Amino acid sequence: TETNKSVILNEAKTLLKETAKQYKNTLIQGLQHNDLKKALKYCNKEVEKLISKDNEKDYTIKRVSLRPRNKNNYPTLYEKEILEKFNKLSLEDNKYLALEHTEIIKDENNNNKFVYAKAIRIKEVCLNCHGSNINNDLKKEIQKLYPDDKAINYKLNDIRGAFVMYRNIKD
């Protein structure tokens, strides 16, 4: 029903907002000490634990990107379509708009899943590690941790990727 969809959407928004907040707060802690390497190491070790966990409410949260730093963040074909839509919308003079996508899909077992995706935009602080003018020491550290890094040369407000939440829906 529409009411159920609305409840699920509100839960999804709250859950993703909390996940994004935890992610951002921890990175900011590393940055407050002017320690980009510390923030980078957190990204490498701890963020995956935060992002890719299933919880008791049948949710799965992923962080995906068309230009990932971490090889685990490549999108599925379905997620790639969402990211491409976000990029297209962003280019159409929506540089400050919060871009979201919601849909109910069938999974590989023909079960209904609610999908909520929210674009991740590049902020000023993100350019330290994802821009075109990265400090050489930091660049070496990034290459050590992520030899196949593609998450560079972003500009302010570019779409970095998205948080995508999947939730099982009982019929």
Residue ranges of predicted features:
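The canonical Cys-X-X-Cys-His
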Residues: 123-133
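Extracytoplasmic c-type cytochrome modules immediately beyond a signal peptide or single-pass transmembrane anchor
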Residues: 2-123, 137-171
